[in-house]
Regions:
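Short, electropositive alpha-helical surface patch
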Residues: 249-261
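Mature N-terminal, pre-catalytic/accessory segment of carbohydrate-active enzymes
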Residues: 31-59
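Acidic (Asp/Glu)-rich catalytic clusters
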Residues: 75-82, 110-117, 227-228, 258-263, ...
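Alpha-helix boundary/N-cap detector
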Residues: 35, 215-218, 331
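Bacterial N-terminal signal peptides
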Residues: 14-24
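Substrate-binding cleft of secreted/luminal carbohydrate-active enzymes
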Residues: 126, 268-369
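Aromatic-lined carbohydrate-binding surfaces of glycoside hydrolases
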Residues: 55-218, 224-228, 232-252, 268-270, ...
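N-terminal secretory signal peptides that target proteins for export/translocation
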Residues: 1-10
Length: 369
């Protein structure tokens, strides 16, 4: 009897142990499965085996030039069939050196040069910088009439990271809209497109009392509408990646979603500045919204500084001159292309002209046929 009772107790212990393990495993799996931040964490793996050359497609491929517009001269893109042209960044103060006096001479020069080779130009209009020593807006805006015009933005370590135009200031937006109208009057229908810079900024109300999340969101939408009114024919786009006060999936206030909805509503294309296929912030915000939406407006994605090695120019550990990283890298261009084409279904890709990656990784992957 004692032996039978002992066996029974042992069997019950074994049963409860197994039952507990099953519950724990099920709970762990359930937690992992239901974690919304993990939803797309493995999406990139589908494209790990992609190889060069990338297949021909309907994507409009452009080469991106930031502060190096002179590099378009004799650039390989001019003789390459798969590249439609150049995306070039121009600052607001490049185009408006003095109040109400517009100078588009450098844009005209670049437009005419590319046109000679049958290539198009896509304008990126800069009002934000990532250099504390440089402001992108005209000096006349840096006055009390426009709330100071610009404010320092800060990185995650609290260090100055560049200057952001006060997009939430009504008077400043009025000046921006006038610039867009002047640009559109001369270039709408001629240039391939024009995009506004990213929506992500490092500004909070504690750093500027005139700032509020809602005022900033409203300002973004007003700029989008002004852009569309100025350029009814050329492609218009905004790099909508993040909005202050929100980080999906945990704090979803509907800010970024509303930008995507509004862009679709008024005909402004949507995109992002960094194709980061393994990072949760990007995967859960701009990339998720591009993937999940059903859009009639064009979508675009940029491969910018650092992206060729899985980083961004804002990463604290990013070193553009890291020779070891350059030599040990894997060419992820086929992966990036596959992800953008299939997962995001983009219309435009903007490949930054960064050495040595563009020459050594991008060019060999695109057949010149």
């Amino acid at each position: 009897m004692k032996s039978a009772l002992r066996k029974f107790k042992l069997s019950m212990k074994a049963f409860f142990l197994c039952f507990t393990l099953i519950i724990l495993c099920t709970s762990a799996n359930s937690q992992e499965w239901n974690n919304p931040a993990e939803k797309y964490k493995d999406a990139y793996k589908k494209y790990l085996n992609a190889t060069c050359p990338v297949p021909k497609d309907n994507i409009q491929h452009f080469v991106y030039f930031a502060r190096d517009r002179e590099s378009i001269i004799n650039h390989p893109l001019l003789q390459h069939a798969m590249f439609k042209g150049a995306q070039i960044m121009y600052s607001w103060k490049d185009f408006e050196p003095e109040k109400g006096i517009y100078d588009f001479s450098i844009l005209k020069e670049d437009y005419e040069y590319l046109k000679k080779y049958g290539k198009k130009i896509f304008v990126q209009l800069q009002d934000v910088t990532f250099n504390p020593k440089y402001k992108a807006i005209p000096d006349y805006l840096l006055t009390g009439e426009y709330g100071g015009g610009a404010i320092l933005q800060y990185n995650d370590e609290g260090k100055p990271d560049g200057w952001i135009a006060k997009r939430w200031n009504k008077k400043l937006r009025e000046r921006f809209a006038l610039l867009l109208l002047a640009l559109g009057k001369e270039f709408d229908g001629k240039i391939e497109g024009i995009n506004l810079q990213e929506t992500a900024i490092g500004v909070r109300q504690k750093t500027d009392s005139s700032f509020s999340e809602q005022a900033y969101l409203n300002g973004l939408k007003e700029n989008m509408l002004a852009l569309k009114k100025a350029f009814p024919s050329s492609t218009t786009m905004i790099y909508a990646n993040f909005v202050p006060g929100e980080m999906m999936p945990w704090t979803d206030k509907g800010y970024l979603r509303s930008i995507y909805q509004y862009g679709e509503q008024i005909g402004v294309g949507l995109g992002g500045p960094d194709l980061m296929v393994t990072r949760k912030p990007q995967l859960n915000n701009p990339l998720a919204l591009m993937h999940e939406g059903n859009y009639t407006v064009p979508l675009g994605i940029a491969i910018q500084d650092g992206n060729y090695t899985g980083k961004t120019g804002a990463d604290l550990d990013y070193n553009e001159d890291d020779e070891k990283e350059k030599k040990s890298r894997k060419n992820i261009v086929p992966l990036l292309h596959g992800f953008a084409k299939d997962f995001l279904k983009v219309t435009y890709m903007f490949w930054v002209n960064q050495d040595p990656y563009f020459k050594e990784d991008v060019m060999p992957c695109f057949l010149n046929e």
